[in-house]
Amino acid sequence: VRVLICLGKENEKLRKAFDLDADEFFATGVSIVMHPENPHVPIIHMNIRYFESGNTWWFGGGIDLTPVYIVPEDASYFHQTLKSVCDQYDPSCYFKFKKWADDYFYLAHRKETRGIGGIFFDRLS
């Protein structure tokens, strides 16, 4: 588990890229990366982050699983749980976030997504 808290001055490139109007930023996040020794327990990556600069702010993050041995019922449960959480906010966001994760975590050299996938989102305010 890693916790990040960062305060800093923005440079011109950052201000232009994200259309920011302040000179300073605040960012914080929590990341969990677990590579268990037991091959029956999947690898998990999870990150949630928050960025703020002046009146501009957003959240980003994601979660995905990479099992060594894929159990279809477990994969289905994982995705159904993510969908249930997303549906509380907007029934369309799970499919958008899942595609975003599939694209973001695509392993071009293997021509496949990482593990059984998950969700990814950024710049949500």
Residue ranges and their predicted role:
Residues 54-96:
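Compact, glycine/acidic-enriched structural inserts
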Residues 90-125:
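A contiguous, surface-oriented mixed alpha/beta subdomain in the mid-to-C-terminal portion of proteins
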Residues 26-29, 57-66, 111-125:
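Glycine-rich, often proline-containing surface loops adjacent to acidic residues and nearby aromatics
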Residues 1-17:
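Gly/Pro-rich turn-and-neighbor structural signature
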Residues 36, 52, 67-69, 123-125:
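Beta-strand elements of well-folded, non-transmembrane domains
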Residues 30-43:
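Conserved phosphate/anionic-ligand binding catalytic regions in large, soluble enzymes, centered on
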Residues 12-19, 23, 27-29, 50-52:
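N-terminal accessory/cap region of cofactor-dependent oxidoreductases and related radical enzymes
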Residues 12, 41-43, 71-74:
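Short helix/loop capping segments that flank catalytic or ligand/cofactor-binding pockets
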